Amino acid sequence: MINPKTTATPAGERELLIEREFAAPRELVFKAWTERDRLMQWWGPPTWPIDYCTVDLGVGGAWHYRMRGPAGEEGWGKGVYREIMPSSRLVYSDYFSDEDGTEIPPEAIAEIDFVDRGGTTLVRNKTIFASGEHREQVLGMGVVEGMSETMDRLDEHLAAVAAG
């Protein structure tokens, strides 16, 4: 189900913009996207959470993860960092992968901006796909619903951290 707090807008032929505002400081939201232990608590929809994750945060480094479905099926993903501006911006090449981290084309580029709104943080996640067909394929796989549910889990994680 898509939470109305999360907006998803196809742009141009190859882009998808997903936005969500969180009641947490920008530094904490950025850490949630870049620290392994935090990612393990929220990445993926509730029915496809990650159960394995490594993070090598640095340009040229990668995060590699496994999502596990309700019947035990698995899906692997990998992001190779291209740009890191602490607490402000992440850019990475986004791929499906295998368990060894071998990238499976086509590549998409994820540009994630963390916008300070004076006590809240807007996450602006723009994905640029290799082609319009690639975007349509990923949309057909339910990426909008999955990211909305994932953002709900991030919201819950941030609230739990704030509550101590």
Regions found by a protein language model. Name each.
Residues 1-49:
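Hydrophobic ligand-binding cavity/cleft-lining segments
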Residues 10-12, 57, 71-75, 102-106, ...:
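A generic structural micro-feature
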Residues 13-19, 26, 50, 62, ...:
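Intrinsic-disorder/low-complexity, polar/charged segments enriched in Ser/Thr/Lys/Arg/Asp/Glu/Gln
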Residues 26-27, 56-58, 82-89, 113-122:
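A short, structured loop/turn motif at beta-sheet edges
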Residues 29, 39, 63-65, 81, ...:
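Hydrophobic pocket/interface hotspot
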Residues 51-95:
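Glycine-rich portal/gate segments that line the openings of hydrophobic small-molecule binding cavities
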Residues 52, 158-164:
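Short, highly charged C-terminal tails/helix-capping segments
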Residues 93, 97-148:
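Beta-strand/loop substructures that line and gate deep hydrophobic ligand-binding cavities in soluble
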